[in-house]
From Swiss-Prot:
Protein topology in the membrane: Peripheral membrane protein
Taxonomy of the source species: Eukaryota, Fungi, Dikarya, Ascomycota, Saccharomycotina
Quaternary structure and interacting proteins, as annotated: Heterohexamer; composed of 3 copies of TIM9 and 3 copies of TIM10, named soluble 70 kDa complex. Associates directly with the TIM22 complex, whose core is composed of TIM22 and TIM54. Interacts with the transmembrane regions of multi-pass transmembrane proteins in transit.
InterPro entries per record: Tim10-like, Tim10-like_dom_sf
Name the UniProt record assigns to this protein: Mitochondrial import inner membrane translocase subunit TIM10
Any single Pfam family the record assigns to this protein: zf-Tim10_DDP
């Protein structure tokens, strides 16, 4: 408030740019998840148009591990960011 000690207010353009960057990151993460889990869990030669039980289970586990890893990496990055933030030196 009044520029004293608070977060600076972002302009509409800055908010839009931040939202676009976040959308790009989420889209990239989704595409990597699909690509990695597809390569790991689904044979290159399809015998059936539907996923079989093994493929479905593999994909479920792959996606769960991918998100769990993403959360852990995010938490570690946040801790590192706080440790090296200005005023900590």
């Amino acid at each position: 408030m009044f520029g004293l000690g608070g977060q600076p207010q972002l302009s509409s353009q800055q908010k839009l740019s931040a939202a676009e960057a976040e959308l790009d990151l989420v889209t990239d993460m989704f595409n990597k998840l699909v690509d990695n889990c597809h390569k790991k869990c689904i044979e290159q030669i399809y015998n059936d148009g539907q996923l079989n039980k093994n493929e479905s289970t593999c994909i479920d586990r792959c996606v769960a591990k991918y998100f769990e890893t993403n959360v852990k990496v995010g938490e570690n990055m946040q801790q590192l960011g706080q440790a090296f933030s200005p005023g900590k030196f």
